[in-house]
Amino acid sequence: MNVVIVADDGYIQHAGVMLTSLFETNKGCRIRVFLLTNGISDDNQRRLECLCKAYGNSIEICQPDSQLSQYCDIDKLNSSNWSKMIYYKLFMPHILPLEVERCLFLDVDMVVVDNLNELYNIPLNPNAIIAAVEDVISCLPRKD
């Protein structure tokens, strides 16, 4: 299973929690994680690598700015409100290795509560380039 996440040092802790929940709920599934980032510290990179290795999985750190320069001036996409990293997911076909035919993009500020194998293997139209689910919002009443 190929999983793509986007994070920088400010969200690495969130990424670690999400990845732990992913690995715990998908034991027995070999997971290859691609982290798209504009840079993380060596210490945080080691932490993520150790986490993935502890579960028998792998992580590839991708810093795609130079790859994307042939498609757009990525630095012009930066604003005071948004990091240019939010655009990385739009360019996944140009960032990921060619052998990656399918992947799940997961936000790092979530917790995976069930096995994702069924979702990952949903049959898609051969011409599909993207599939998405509707946003899911909990409508349960608040318990005070």
Residue ranges and their predicted role:
Residues 1-144:
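Glycosyltransferase catalytic domains, chiefly GT-A lineage
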